[in-house]
Amino acid sequence: MRINPTTSGSAVSTLEEKNLGRIAQIIGPVLDVVFPPGKMPNIYNALVVKGRDTVGQQINVICEVQQLLGNNRVRAVAMSATDGLTRGMEVIDTGAALSVPVGGATLGRIFNVLGEPIDNLGPVDTRTTSPIHRSAPAFIQLDTKLSIFETGIKVVDLLAPYRRGGKIGLFGGAGVGKTVLIMELINNIAKAHGGVSVFGGVGERTREGNDLYMEMKESGVINEKNIAESKVALVYGQMNEPPGARMRVGLTALTMAEYFRDVNEQDVLLFIDNIFRFVQAGSEVSALLGRMPSAVGYQPTLSTEMGSLQERITSTKEGSITSIQAVYVPADDLTDPAPATTFAHLDATTVLSRGLSAKGIYPAVDPLDSTSTMLQPRIVGEEHYETAQRVKQTLQRYKELQDIIAILGLDELSEEDRLTVARARKIERFLSQPFFVAEVFTGSPGKYVGLAETIRGFQLILSGELDSLPEQAFYLVGNIDEATAKAMNLEGEKK
């Protein structure tokens, strides 16, 4: 991997003398800049606009070249607000793409799209930087082995397993436990895999970004006392940012993740919240760049933009980037071009259910709606596959019987159906699990359950060996031995 050392001050001053242009036109976040003949910047070069506005305030706006228009004119997209810019202002061509800090110094810190810290905790070590525009790893570098990425979360590992180096779509409304699930995954990858995480907040609410940061500090994912011990780097380009920043913040987060994979040879979790906002920002910029809109008003380059981001998220022989992407579906229309283009890249989907959350079953992952391409006998093995299928069949039958139970009651069911319902209710409760990051809220210690233990537990429930245990014994426990111990305690309390 190529690492760009930070440009020294003397180099910048010579650049200023060499490649100076002037603003010719400003259309919102898009600028047209005129350069001297033969001094045209390359596509994706970073341009810097320095000057003062009408009230004397210092202006420092970074732009990215998107088009070469001819007649020594380029069109660039601003990464911050263009307020106060005027025609004729000087523009410096830096001669390189946007570069951001990478490595251990980024952990525990919050950055903007330009890689500048925005958490008021002082400067970041910028000796190691990397450009945000890079090619996807060459085919020969890819790790072609299909392997499961064990999360320690029972419902995920059993029914919708994640692929190491894969892409997972996370679907769920507000208040169903998306943030807590994300934090638990960050915690578990650090403890079980010695990996780190990068969180890219793309075009979402600033309040949510702040809440996530506060909760991460509270749960220990970000270590305030020793920042270097933190397990995650945060990159935010929120709703109030111009479209240029929202369009590129995903690449900034990805660049930081690539360094951990390629240089530190670690397993990395990359969270993107929300991938739809990445498309939306591209759509806003596309119209301003004069491109003809495509279906439903989206940019004609939608598939290319999505592909250039997604293809960089992969496993190599050094390490892996496993990406979990929150997907907003506009008007719940799955055929909308934005979510439809995203689905083409996903290996698994994790769907959070409000119904399960209302029952108090956390994580509220819907076992019937969540899917994974990894759940095949040749990948996970016959035992895992058979157990998962039987669990799904039992839950599906319970779902079909719920209307009858609501109208006529349990007594009207056949003996076989009553047994199915009893086991399904135990399975439903056993799919819940106490989280490490929720210890501060619940008071019960978190549990990491290995895949073999998970399969053994569900096999025992399905076989009927535990039919005599009360269903509350299976609620919020780790492995099956804890459920049997809890049942004995409940029995003792009754006496």
From Swiss-Prot:
PROSITE patterns: ATPASE_ALPHA_BETA. GO terms for molecular function: ATP binding; ATP hydrolysis activity; proton-transporting ATP synthase activity, rotational mechanism. It is found in: Plastid, Chloroplast thylakoid membrane. Its main location: plastid. Keywords: ATP synthesis, ATP-binding, CF(1), Chloroplast, Hydrogen ion transport, Ion transport, Membrane, Nucleotide-binding, Plastid, Thylakoid, Translocase, Transport. Its EC number is 7.1.2.2. The keyword Nucleotide-binding applies. It is a peripheral membrane protein. GO terms for cellular component: chloroplast thylakoid membrane; mitochondrion; proton-transporting ATP synthase complex. GO terms for biological process: proton motive force-driven mitochondrial ATP synthesis. Pfam families: ATP-synt_ab (PF00006), ATP-synt_ab_N (PF02874), ATP-synt_VA_C (PF22919). It is an enzyme of class 7 (translocase). InterPro entries: AAA+_ATPase, ATP-synt_VA_C, ATP_synth_F1_bsu, ATPase_a/bsu_AS, ATPase_alpha/beta_chains, ATPase_F1/V1/A1_a/bsu_N, ATPase_F1/V1/A1_a/bsu_N_sf, ATPase_F1/V1/A1_a/bsu_nucl-bd. ATP binds at residues 172-179. It comes from the Eukaryota. It catalyses: ATP + H2O + 4 H(+)(in) = ADP + phosphate + 5 H(+)(out). F-type ATPases have 2 components, CF(1) - the catalytic core - and CF(0) - the membrane proton channel. CF(1) has five subunits: alpha(3), beta(3), gamma(1), delta(1), epsilon(1). CF(0) has four main subunits: a(1), b(1), b'(1) and c(9-12). Belongs to the ATPase alpha/beta chains family. Produces ATP from ADP in the presence of a proton gradient across the membrane. The catalytic sites are hosted primarily by the beta subunits. This is ATP synthase subunit beta, chloroplastic. It comes from Hyacinthoides non-scripta. The gene is atpB.
